[in-house]
A protein has these predicted regions:
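A short, conserved structural fragment
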Residues: 1, 149-159
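Basic, amphipathic "hinge/linker" alpha-helix immediately C-terminal to the N-terminal HTH DNA-binding motif
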Residues: 1-20, 162-181
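Globin-like tetrapyrrole-binding proteins
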Residues: 23, 184
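C-terminal regulatory/oligomerization modules of transcriptional regulators
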Residues: 28-93, 193-233
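Conserved phosphate-binding loops in nucleotide/dinucleotide-binding enzymes
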Residues: 96
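N-terminal helix-turn-helix DNA-binding core of bacterial DNA-binding proteins
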Residues: 99-140
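Short, hydrophobic-biased segments on the C-terminal half of alpha helices
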Residues: 145-146
Length: 233
């Protein structure tokens, strides 16, 4: 009888744990998902039900996007991907109880949408600014910006009347994605980097030190480890 293959998480995948926790926090904050809302996380270290929080490892303060400075790192460079001209339709994110992170995946699964949110954290606001940074066709860029506005991640305000042009700013829903992006950046620097070094350096302005983002238990404030957490469903 042929054996079924058995799959195990590698160290590389286990280190996405904090990213997964931040995805769960965003989902539970902004969507009603019965399958996710009933999940209770228990921290074995303190024995309590907890909520993941992101704090600075240097000063213990909560990490907020407005307190972060983005500086080019030694591996910084412009996006060199070929310009995509073919339009791929995007679907609106809709609440689903079938998967735990369905809304986040629907929203950020498209590379251009994720890139736009990341650039918005850097302070980019205008269509031309996004277009200059990304090798994306203008019709696709317009479609993705419209979708982010429709989903409440970006707000749209006119800055010029003739011709009419808009600035795009992160809403609270959009700003709440920051911990997700920080954990993803940290993982990417470790496993997808180059010999040139990290492309970006984040400075925590509250303490003036390079950002050491840590995902912690909100009960005992210890850094969360995957093997020290269990789930009650």
């Amino acid at each position: 009888t042929a054996r079924h293959p058995v799959y195990h998480l590698t160290k590389k995948s286990i280190e996405l744990y904090h990213n997964g926790l931040m995805a769960m926090v965003w989902e539970r904050t902004h969507f009603s998902s019965p399958s996710l809302d009933k999940v209770e996380l228990i921290h074995n270290h303190c024995g309590r039900a907890f909520w993941p929080v992101m704090q600075c490892g240097s000063c213990d303060q909560q990490i907020r996007p407005e307190d972060i400075a983005f500086n080019p790192g030694p591996g910084a460079g412009k996006d060199q991907r070929a310009t995509k001209t073919r339009r791929r339709s995007s679907t609106d994110a809709q609440s689903s109880s079938k998967t735990l992170y369905n809304n986040l995946i629907n929203l950020l699964g498209d590379r251009w949408t994720a890139n736009l949110v990341a650039l918005a954290f850097h302070g980019l606001k205008r269509f031309d600014e996004f277009n200059q940074e990304l090798p994306v066709a203008t019709n696709i860029l317009a479609d993705r910006l419209k979708r982010l506005v429709n989903e409440g991640v970006l707000s749209q305000q006119p800055y010029q009347r003739s011709p009419l042009r808009y600035e795009y700013q992160l809403t609270d829903k959009g700003r709440d994605l920051f911990p997700y992006f920080v954990t993803l950046l940290s993982w990417g620097n470790k496993y997808c980097g180059t010999d040139a070094g990290d492309p970006m350096e984040l400075i925590h302005n509250l303490c003036g030190r390079p950002l050491q983002a840590q995902v912690r238990c909100d009960q005992c404030f210890e850094v969360l480890v995957a093997t020290e957490v269990h789930f009650n469903l």
